[in-house]
Amino acid sequence: MKMKKIHYILLIAVAFLVSNCDTNDDGFYNNVFVDVPNLVSIESPTTTYTVGQKLYVSSQFPRILNDGALIDIFQTTGANEFVFSYVIEKQINPTVWEVVTVNDSQLDIVKGDAQNGSFVYAICQYNTVSGLYEYRVGFPLLSTGTYRMSFGYNSDSKDTVELRSLSPATRLILNINSLITGLDANGFYNFTVN
């Protein structure tokens, strides 16, 4: 009988512990989310480009942002860099799109940094003189065809760019969801290269 009581007490204790677990990993990983529109843009958007032109994506935002309240993102995160991603695809046939890749050396990196593989890994770098996070990179358009670009390689969002701070290990990680204009209902910027 005594053994049965111990089992019941243990079972109740475990049930109590499990029922009070916090399943919100954001607090554990120090993640915070804010919404600030128009931090990333497609420069001079047009539906037609010519071979040899570059498609420029840019971002320039201050360290103090307004998400209903002013937040100093540099002081809060300690991050010198914020990252986001985008994908450029070329239409192979009516139902098949192929990711377009170029060597990193072919990217026209004006501000910030970028790495290209199956997507462009865009890095907005903090400019200590201006107090701005900056990114401006041109992607070379090397062949004719129908193209599309989308933001967020690992995202389901269709109208926002997700910027993430590269914060030191002990600091807050800030995720900024930024509405972007110029995309279709499926989240693509469509264009043709002649």
Regions found by a protein language model. Give the residues of each.
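Sec-dependent bacterial lipoprotein signal peptides
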Residues: 1-21
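Bacterial Sec-dependent N-terminal signal peptides
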Residues: 18-40
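First exposed extracellular module after export/assembly in secreted or surface-exposed proteins
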Residues: 34-194
